Amino acid sequence: MCCTTVVVVRKPATERLKRPSVGRLGLFDPHAAENLALLGWYDYDCREHVDLLWSLSRAPDADAVLRPMVRLFENPATGWDELNAALLTDRGLRGRLFAVLGSSLALGDHLVAHPQSWKLLRGRVSLPSRTQLHQAFDECVSNFGDDPLDAPDSVLPRLRTLYCDQLLVLAALDLAATVEDEPVLPFTLVAAQLADIADAAMATALRVAEKIVCGDRTPPRLAVIAMGKWGARELNYVSDVDIIFVAEQADPLSTRVASEMMRVASEAFFQVDAGLRPEGRNGELVRTVESHIAYYQRWAKTWEFQALLKARSAVGDAELGERYLAALMPMVWAACERADFVAEVQAMRRRVEQLVPADVRGRELKLGSGGLRDVEFAVQLLQLVHGRSDESLHVVSTVDALAALGEGGYIGREDAANLTASYEFLRLLEHRLQLQRLKRTHLLPEDGDEEAVRWLARAAHIRPDGRHDAAGVLREELKNQNLRVSQLHAKLFYQPLLESIGPASLEIRHGMTSEAAERQLATLGYEGSQTALKHISALVNQSGRRGRVQSVLLPRLLNWMSYAPDPDGGLLAYRRLSEALSAETWYLSTLRDKPAVARRLMHVLGTSVYVPDLLMRAPEVIQSYGDGLAGPKLLEAEPAMVARALITSAGRHTDPIRAIDAARSLRRRELARVGSADLLGLLEVTEVCKALTSVWVAVLQAALDAVIRAYLPDGDKAPAAIAVIGMGRLGGAELGYGSDADVMFVCEPAIGVEDAQALRWSGMIAERVCRLLRTPSVDPPLDVDANLRPEGRNGPLVRTLGAYAAYYAQWAQPWEIQALLRAHAVAGDADLGQRFLLMADKMRYPPDGVSAEAVREIRRMKARVEAERLPRGADPHTHTKLGRGGLADIEWTVQLMQLRHAHELPALHKTSTLESLDAIAAANLIPEADVDLLRQAWLTATRARNALVLVRGKTTDQLPGPGRQLNAVAVAAGWPSDDGSEFLDNYLRVTRRAKTFVRKVFGS
């Protein structure tokens, strides 16, 4: 029959409602039609059945509804006729039941296991009050323990069923609007109801635990402090419930009751976690109020005070719980005065970002960029910073805290409203994902899983909008909400600061006081908060468009800069750069319209002194901070192409000074490009060294060409050919930012020209080149060092090829032969340069190898260098050049092996340390493991040495001690975090191991 106890008069065929097809109902199960017929829902065309079918089609997953309905039909305990009749006539029941079955497989299984629970969803259903919840749970265990034969766990199944029934009712009311025209429950109401259910459940768990442990004895006084989302009454459907126990006496009996309570609750309801207690899982489970006070006064970290923001006395002895809160909450609001508060907050901010594995970062609702943790962490931090002086911020829930921050002027009211809306949307999705299987999760479906995305959209009551289907609308909404949270996250911290110092046109009309602004800046990592405020004030109070644009930009820029190792230095550099480029309209427009450029620039400014100084005079490099079609624009310029452009540009000038100025200009731009790419992790250290060598070589060539042009009248022929031989790291193409250029000059008289005349002219040219390049300027210095030439400073600056050959054959010391190992022709006459190298080969790679006496002399010299050349006061463990396992150790070791074996192994005829190490490994001269030790030490020391120049802006070889500067060096060297101590430990470990092998080669 069509409807129970209802006489149905069939309409004529022309008046019957059209029964929708299985496909139109959104049913994809191949047995769907069969199951509909089994239930009797597909046999009639009357309005009741058609309405029921359309209700089914609106469920988030109609197939997921149908499967448990068939199981209920088949279960005699269901009372199918009663249920079916109710579904046909009770639209509210239909909406609630179909919505919950289409959204939660787990609650569907619960309903099948307890088929009479469907009756909880019919009629006028409302959420039970806190009192009703406590009564229901109390009644469930009212007679527990009356019978001495009761097993301790006999009550658990009843409690589990009751708890799931409460979730069923709440979820059904929460979801009903997805199927029928039912009221939408606000997120805050759902989260608070979940917390109320947890309160009642935990109170019952405590009662059961007391009965199991104490029997008829008086139980100990025990308070259960709710923490986390439970404490804030913003609980998820599936959460670990965080607790702290406080006892009148922290004795074994109290501990047993607490342990038993956790066990009962975990088995009947949800996972209970006491990990937020003092000392975490290693600490005592139960403490007295006095013990808690002592711990928080002496040992607690900032994150532990942050966790207490959510503390609430929820279960057990109320007086004891309130005493605990009264004692500890004043410490929470004073936490920002602690000496290590800023450092710990910075560490927490970075830890939040590092928690998410890269492969799921885009799917993370909680920990991803623009996710829930961004909101929660920001809100809690602002509460900690300002709650000391403003009791209106002493609230536990995130939504209430956002409202209080808006009312107090700590964030804009509109921003607070927008952030609340985004937060509630993301929490709604989190709830829907957890409901599906009653599992703790905050991972969105994989983007390619269209079915899962569509289900989530429908469960979240998202419908097609004409341009996209429900899944497409969800994707767009997620993107928009994440973006809004990311943008507001920065604005949250910094916009009110601008109001406290900026013009009245800014959006917040009642910004925080200057004292509060300084306090907040200090918390965010700005050590000189007063000075920082002055810089910010100077930027936003500029007249006209510039000040307005800075007011818009600064919240985001300051936030990004706060993650850099030196925010104070970065802010000063940003102010100087902005003032220097005040006439350039593209500058602020680029930062406004291209967030990737702005973010990278803030990192560079907050890490380096060297690069910002270059950007002042080569600002066009900033425009290369973005990405092109082929990747980062900073990598588009090839070093060889830059070198050719530099030589060509300098060649346009007849005046050597102007030519050198042109060369400096292009070098400046190239140094800014390479330094920026290095700081942003876009270049390997070997690529950096080659690029720096390339530009140095180009400058040498440009300078030599310019001076020769100036000293040759038009049409005259040069009296000599000149070649520049690169030595040291220049010859090995391994220059760093602070390296000078070790060179030697060689000449060859032109036909018919006397040696004396050629040498006089060549010496004048070489001296002029060196003097021009050494001329002081605002750019990094161009120091040319020719002291490796024969006889050093006492010898002539230029020699003929024959004179070099004679000197090396007759007078050269072992160290001079060693220096030739890195000789390479870099500029000037290429043919002459190659002939010099052929001559040098006979000296550095003699047919029978170097003598044993020469090897002993080199070892003695190495010992003398270690004893005498290390600067006074330098730490030998952390001196990157001359320290233990530093650059000199590795290079001398490699060169000694070249001297001993290169006559037999042409592969060792290399000027590069790294290439020589590769050849040593290939020839099996030493074990590969030892080669790797040397290689890693050289790379580590080179990165550190380069980073020192980038950070300090001047040449230095000594790593600083622990502190902000060491942190900056770590970041500049490519260390994965800004923990300078970790970086230093790694440096010491790598260089110590390398030094062990170096001692084997040279002797201790």
UniProtKB/Swiss-Prot annotation:
What's the catalysed reaction?
[glutamine synthetase]-O(4)-(5'-adenylyl)-L-tyrosine + phosphate = [glutamine synthetase]-L-tyrosine + ADP; [glutamine synthetase]-L-tyrosine + ATP = [glutamine synthetase]-O(4)-(5'-adenylyl)-L-tyrosine + diphosphate
- What HAMAP family does the record point to? GlnE
Keyword vocabulary terms for this entry: ATP-binding, Magnesium, Multifunctional enzyme, Nucleotide-binding, Nucleotidyltransferase, Transferase
Q: Which CDD domains match?
A: NT_GlnE_GlnD_like (cd05401)
User: What family does the entry list?
Assistant: Belongs to the GlnE family.
Residue numbers spanned by region Adenylyl transferase: 502-1004
Function, as annotated:
Involved in the regulation of glutamine synthetase GlnA, a key enzyme in the process to assimilate ammonia. When cellular nitrogen levels are high, the C-terminal adenylyl transferase (AT) inactivates GlnA by covalent transfer of an adenylyl group from ATP to specific tyrosine residue of GlnA, thus reducing its activity. Conversely, when nitrogen levels are low, the N-terminal adenylyl removase (AR) activates GlnA by removing the adenylyl group by phosphorolysis, increasing its activity.
Q: Which cofactor does it need?
A: Mg(2+)
Under the heading Pfam families, the entry gives: GlnD_UR_UTase, GlnE
Enzyme Commission number: 2.7.7.89, 2.7.7.42
Stated name of the protein: Bifunctional glutamine synthetase adenylyltransferase/adenylyl-removing enzyme
**Region (Adenylyl removase) location:** 1-497
InterPro entries xrefs: GlnE, GlnE_rpt_dom, NT_sf, PII_UdlTrfase/GS_AdlTrfase
Protein's GO biological process: regulation of glutamine family amino acid metabolic process
Q: Which GO terms describe its molecular function?
A: [glutamate-ammonia-ligase] adenylyltransferase activity; [glutamine synthetase]-adenylyl-L-tyrosine phosphorylase activity; ATP binding; magnesium ion binding
Tell me which PANTHER family the record gives: BIFUNCTIONAL GLUTAMINE SYNTHETASE ADENYLYLTRANSFERASE_ADENYLYL-REMOVING ENZYME, GLUTAMINE SYNTHETASE ADENYLYLTRANSFERASE
Transmembrane intervals: none
GO cellular component terms? cytosol
